[in-house]
Amino acid sequence: MATLLLRSQRLHRSLRHRTRPTVDVLLRAASHGARLLYPDHIPTTPLQKMLLAAGAAGMALYNPYRHDMVAVLGETTGCHTLKFLRDQMKKDPEGAQILQERPRISLSTLDLSKLQSLPEGSLGREYLRFLNANKVSPDTRAPTRFVDDEELAYVIQRYREVHDMLHTLLGMPTNMLGEVVVKWFEAVQTGLPMCILGALFGPVRLRAQSLQVLFSELIPWAIQNGRRAPCVLNIYYEQRWEQPLTALREELGISPPPKHIQGLA
């Protein structure tokens, strides 16, 4: 299991090194001499953000699995929403602790052996099961680059890194239908423009059977849970690995997922 995740990590790093310079080179001259607020920061003007957002939106809609484009879209359109989410975190004791301590979810911070040793049904064990079953790695989340505020940059980075945790909480797979359902939940929870766009336009690639289930059952379920649950960014998941997943769902007001979701795509 750990070997699978490490292989995914190496593959992502290889792809990232090949694709990332494209954007960096285009903006390096414009940002030369500007003050960098965090290691991967690329300062951009409002016009540059608008152009980046337009291009990223087109690519993300064409191929929703282009996580790099989804990331750019989120960073260039979500400034006001990120401020609201940051303020929500500051008002909550657990959220404020997260903002202060800045935990990261990656292969370098996760103790895979410990997660594997946790009881069946615990958050940590189920999260690891999700990663393994779907062949995904927490290291596939792109670093924040285009947010011109160090604290807000962490907020959107945290949102990205708990995305797979939301899949685990909601019981959603990583196929297109599962991603759309999670996007509806995230859209209600966060209000981020990229989540709203993903929720609205993601269904265009689904089959008729999946669309019927999506609109009749899954979207209402996701909206209801998104409204009922407190801000999911205020959950210090790393301190709750041993908590039973069912207990955490009850605490957050998240009802069990529909059982037939796994057979659809």
Swiss-Prot record:
Annotated transit peptide: 1-29
Gene Ontology molecular function: 4-hydroxy-3-methoxy-5-polyprenylbenzoate decarboxylase activity; carboxy-lyase activity
Recorded topology in the membrane: Peripheral membrane protein
InterPro entries: Coq4 (IPR007715), Coq4_euk (IPR027540)
Subcellular location: Mitochondrion inner membrane
GO CC annotations, alphabetized: extrinsic component of mitochondrial inner membrane; mitochondrial inner membrane; mitochondrion; protein-containing complex; ubiquinone biosynthesis complex
The keyword Transcription is assigned to this record: no
Listed cofactors: Zn(2+)
Binding site for Zn(2+): H163, D164, H167, E179
Biochemical pathway: Cofactor biosynthesis; ubiquinone biosynthesis
Domain of life from the UniProt record: Eukaryota
Record's keyword annotation contains Ribonucleoprotein: no
Catalytic activities: 4-hydroxy-3-methoxy-5-(all-trans-decaprenyl)benzoate + H(+) = 2-methoxy-6-(all-trans-decaprenyl)phenol + CO2
EC number(s) from the headed UniProt entry: 4.1.1.130
Pfam families: Coq4 (PF05019)
List of residues that carry Phosphoserine: S108
Keyword annotations of the record: Lyase, Membrane, Metal-binding, Mitochondrion, Mitochondrion inner membrane, Phosphoprotein, Transit peptide, Ubiquinone biosynthesis, Zinc
GO biological-process terms attached to the record: ubiquinone biosynthetic process
Record's subunit section: Component of a multi-subunit COQ enzyme complex, composed of at least COQ3, COQ4, COQ5, COQ6, COQ7 and COQ9.
Primary role: Lyase that catalyzes the C1-decarboxylation of 4-hydroxy-3-methoxy-5-(all-trans-decaprenyl)benzoic acid into 2-methoxy-6-(all-trans-decaprenyl)phenol during ubiquinone biosynthesis.
PANTHER family xrefs: UBIQUINONE BIOSYNTHESIS PROTEIN, UBIQUINONE BIOSYNTHESIS PROTEIN COQ4 HOMOLOG, MITOCHONDRIAL
Family per similarity comment: Belongs to the COQ4 family.
Name assigned to this protein: Ubiquinone biosynthesis protein COQ4 homolog, mitochondrial
Organism: Rattus norvegicus (Rat)
Organism lineage: Eukaryota, Metazoa, Chordata, Craniata, Vertebrata
Gene (UniProt): Coq4
